[in-house]
Structure formats: C-alpha cells, structure tokens
Amino acid sequence: MDLESEIIQLVRQNIRPKFPSLNDEQQARLDNALKYDVNYDILKKELVEYIDDWKRNEYYDVLTNIGDLQRLDLGNMLNGDGVSFPKLHSDLANLPRFRLIDNENEMDQSLLHKYDSLRTRLIEKCRAIELIRSATNTDVNYQDINSMLSVVELRQWRDEIQMEWKELAQNLELILKTWPDLTEEKRSKLLQLIDSSSLKSILHIKDNIE
C-alpha cells in the first residue's frame, strides 16, 4: 500500500467519531447515521499541496541556517589555492598523538581511541587518493593493456610459445646432425647460439654433436 492509500484509509477510519462506551453494534448504527461524503480527489490535491509547502519550508530553513554555500566552494577547498591533498596529508600526519597517564576514565579512553582511529583513517585515505592520482597521471595506457588481456589468453599463449621453442630446438638439432654441407664454422656458430640461449636447457646438442 502506498502513502496516499494509507492516508486515505486513515481518514476513512477516523472521519467518524469513536466512542469507547459503545459496543460494535451501537457504533455501526452511529456510523450509518453520520455518513460523511468526502471528496478524496480534493483531499489528495490538498495533501500534495501541503507536502509541497512543507518541503519548501524545510528547504528555506536549511538555507537560512547553513547559509548560501556554493557547491563550487567545496571543490575549491581541495584544489587550486585551497588545501591540497599533499598538504592535508602532511597536516594530518603532524597532528599530535595523545596518551592517557593514570587515567582509567572510560569516556576519556573512548574519546582518545576515536581520535586516533579517525586520524589514522584520514591519513590512509589521503595516501590512497595520492597513489590513485599518481597512477592516473602515468604514461601507461591501461585501456590498451586491458583490451589486450581480454583478447589474448596469456596462459595458452605461453604454452604455445614453449611448444614452438622446443620445436625450434629440435630443428636445430636435426640441422646439426644431418646437414653434410654444413661447414665447421657455421656449425660452431650454431652451437654458440644454442649455448648462449634458453635452448641449452631444452637440448644437449653440443654434447651429442661432439
């Protein structure tokens, strides 16, 4: 049931007088005798106007009590010539840290705990904001990286590279063993290439050839 229906139901329930001294039958006879004709469309219209007036008065009360504070001013407090995040971070870090000595008052301990907790949380949030800002200003194109990661399955890509690397090593081994016209100079260069690369961990070509 919406608010409008609830209000109309309450009006219907309370528009006729109720007498605790009457029993149900007597109350029903009284209700039938006092039939009020209520125009609920007019009631709804007046109700909406009343709510609008109430909202308007509440707004003016807030505006009067707080003052004409521009939303832009809130932004300038942390930008431009106002208080910067590094300055705010530094000021928070320089706030004193208190300690109770010979004081077991629970209210004092609770207040001190809240102060330290709030100070720590504010420092951590300022530090996090500074890190996010510095990461945002770097030259790394995160959009390109994310798009690449969404297209390439890195694990599958790594497995394919390992298979191709092993196939390359096997081909080199075959070349060294079966090519009769391969000169000693070229053979030596290939062996040096294998010896200085990751192929050495895959094949022991040098030992087999020699």
Curated annotation (Swiss-Prot):
GO BP of this protein: cell division; meiotic cell cycle
Protein localization: Nucleus; Chromosome, Centromere, Kinetochore
Record-level GO cellular component terms: kinetochore; nucleus
UniProt keyword list: Cell cycle, Cell division, Centromere, Chromosome, Kinetochore, Meiosis, Mitosis, Nucleus
Keyword rRNA processing among UniProt keywords: no
Entry keyword annotation includes Cell wall biogenesis/degradation: no
Family, as annotated: Belongs to the NKP1 family.
Descriptive protein name: Inner kinetochore subunit NKP1
Species name: Kluyveromyces lactis (strain ATCC 8585 / CBS 2359 / DSM 70799 / NBRC 1267 / NRRL Y-1140 / WM37)
Species lineage: Eukaryota, Fungi, Dikarya, Ascomycota, Saccharomycotina
